């Protein structure tokens, strides 16, 4: 049997950047550096960073007041940044630039009077972060999706979770 390896392989640039930011924070400030959500969905990388002093948490409230935190590549809703300010946390935002682009597009389209449908996986950190940017409706499974009661004349924009494959997106639209 032949095995073909796709090129390129590995992490996307946004994930590499996020990992680098955690390592830079650890090198510059020393441990502990808290990481809001796994920096990447890879247990080997997470374990390696934790061995260097990174502490992964799921909620901002788990982080001691005044500590340093890196928000993951997946992005976070504005409420997380507000909670971090209230706790006087030193925030390093490692949100992937492509995810930030989706966040900015969501805000722009809502500002233009459009409705937004987000295609993504319910509960995924990126989806949570994106849905926190503006009012939108999530399509996770088109078989279970109930169309919102929107005026048929209202313009609609469809955005997608950046980590979805083309096939996943096609199945949802």
Language model feature labels by segment:
Residues 1-173:
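The feature marks the mature, well-folded catalytic cores of soluble enzymes
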């Amino acid at each position: 049997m032949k095995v073909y390896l796709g090129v390129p392989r590995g992490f996307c640039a946004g994930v590499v950047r996020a990992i680098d930011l955690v390592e830079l924070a650890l090198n510059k400030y020393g441990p502990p550096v808290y990481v809001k959500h796994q920096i990447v969905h890879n247990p080997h990388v997470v374990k390696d960073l934790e061995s260097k002093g990174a502490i992964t948490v799921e909620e901002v409230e788990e982080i001691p007041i005044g500590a340093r935190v890196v928000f993951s590549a997946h992005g976070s809703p504005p409420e997380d940044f507000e909670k971090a300010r209230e706790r006087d946390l030193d925030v390093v935002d490692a949100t992937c630039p492509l995810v930030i682009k989706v966040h900015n597009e969501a805000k722009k389209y809502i500002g233009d009077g459009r409705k937004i449908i987000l295609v993504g996986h319910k509960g995924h950190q990126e989806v949570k972060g994106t849905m926190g940017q503006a009012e939108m409706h999530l399509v996770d499974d088109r078989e279970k999706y109930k169309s919102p009661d929107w005026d048929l004349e209202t313009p609609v924009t469809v955005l997608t979770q950046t980590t979805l494959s083309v096939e996943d997106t096609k199945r949802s639209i």
